[in-house]
Amino acid sequence: MPSLTMTDSSYIGRFAPTPSGFLHFGSLVAALASWLDARAVNGRWLLRMEDTDPPREMPGARDAILQTLERYGLHWDGEVVFQSQRHDAYAAVVDRLFNMGLAYACTCSRKQLERYNGIYPGFCRNAGHAREGAAIRLRVPELIYRFTDRVQGEYQQHLGREVGDFVIQRRDGLYAYQLAVVLDDAWQGVTDIVRGADLLDNTPRQLYLQELLGFSQPRYLHIPLIVQPDGHKLGKSYRSPPLQAEHATPLLLRALRALGQETDPELLLATPAEVLAVARTQWRPEAIAQRTTVPEADLR
């Protein structure tokens, strides 16, 4: 795996929030990790809005996300990319995969699949259903896909046994995360993906899609999720409090500690820009805990 140097300006990272709610502390930890990993090597940091699911989108969330990032000093490079404006690109790839026989129409309902624990049993694989009103699934090989995560270490998954053929376009016509994220990362030239460990088990599916479409494989760094006492991650569905501009400095320092970084108590009096300037020069991804969760109660 290529190593990163302090002058690796070829680095392109990204943060890709979903506008289904406001940013919260867990979002901040993910954004900060990806921002620091890019800026520490003089790389670029892109912002992409993963707005492919309009029914889940919260009014005003897009603007609120942009404003919050700016107020916390997490400035991005270039224009914001909106996945809702990329449907033609997604459609072209779905058509190609379907026409090549690499994907097929699936009419299975959620109720039919409930007892299979998320592993698709292949009911429609050879049924030859028409595409209209059906989901589109990608055929997966009976192979193990593995990669070395920069924090979590070696990870592997047998796609056939542990996932099964997976959806790339839903029956309502909306495009699946797995397809959109792979196409957009390749289109934007992303070299490094820093995100939460809840997406660790998604990565082998993305590696397969990258291989199928002839894309380069980026480096991956999956950070521990901040979880509540009941084990659920901080998130919009659990009404985690939104980030407030007036708390930017203490929350940035807390996020740094969640990432295993040293913080100077004197920085409590600093501006967000000053905190980030120091953190950028002291960024040590190897200090991030090799675990998938960190209880919020453990953070100072």
Swiss-Prot record:
EC main group: ligase
Transmembrane spans: none
InterPro entries, alphabetized: Glu-Q_tRNA(Asp)_Synthase, Glu/Gln-tRNA-synth, Glu/Gln-tRNA-synth_Ib_cat-dom, GluQ/Sye, Rossmann-like_a/b/a_fold
Cofactor stoichiometry and binding remark: Binds 1 zinc ion per subunit.
Binding residue positions for L-glutamate: R14, F15, A16, P17, T18, E50, Y177, R195
Keywords from the UniProt entry: Aminoacyl-tRNA synthetase, ATP-binding, Ligase, Metal-binding, Nucleotide-binding, Zinc
Residues binding Zn(2+): C106, C108, Y120, C124
EC number: 6.1.1.-
Sequence motif: 'HIGH' region, positions: 17-27
GO molecular function: ATP binding; glutamate-tRNA ligase activity; zinc ion binding
Names of the cofactor(s): Zn(2+)
Short motif 'KMSKS' region, span: 233-237
Domain of life according to the entry: Bacteria
A Gene Ontology BP annotation from the UniProt entry: tRNA modification
GO CC list: cytosol
Protein residues bound to ATP: K236
The protein's role, per its UniProt record: Catalyzes the tRNA-independent activation of glutamate in presence of ATP and the subsequent transfer of glutamate onto a tRNA(Asp). Glutamate is transferred on the 2-amino-5-(4,5-dihydroxy-2-cyclopenten-1-yl) moiety of the queuosine in the wobble position of the QUC anticodon.
Family listed: Belongs to the class-I aminoacyl-tRNA synthetase family. GluQ subfamily.
Name by which UniProt lists this protein: Glutamyl-Q tRNA(Asp) synthetase
Species for this entry: Pseudomonas putida (strain ATCC 700007 / DSM 6899 / JCM 31910 / BCRC 17059 / LMG 24140 / F1)
